[in-house]
């Protein structure tokens, strides 16, 4: 059973994934690398996902151990704190 407080965060994650898909539809690697607007949009949504993951209950995260929750959260931290070292 899902923790009722998890639902808003799960919605944020799904919305962010949908936005990344929308922003990158028809965009190949080369176009992504030369389009800062798309990069910024994708990076922002990855940060949203990472923050939402941090707020999910331990119960939910434990229920799905195959999902690398900590890696997702760390990606958010990397994007926030080491922004100038990011290589897209």
What does each of the following model-derived ranges do?
Residues 1-88:
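Solvent-exposed interaction patches of small proteins and small membrane subunits
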């Amino acid at each position: 059973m899902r923790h009722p407080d998890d639902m808003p965060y799960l919605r944020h994650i799904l919305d962010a994934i949908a936005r990344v898909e929308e922003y990158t539809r028809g965009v190949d690697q080369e176009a992504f690398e030369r389009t800062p607007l798309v990069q910024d949009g994708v990076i922002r949504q990855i940060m949203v996902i990472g923050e939402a993951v941090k707020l999910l209950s331990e119960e939910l995260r434990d229920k799905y151990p195959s999902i690398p929750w900590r890696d997702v959260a760390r990606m958010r931290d990397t994007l926030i704190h080491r922004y100038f070292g990011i290589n897209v």
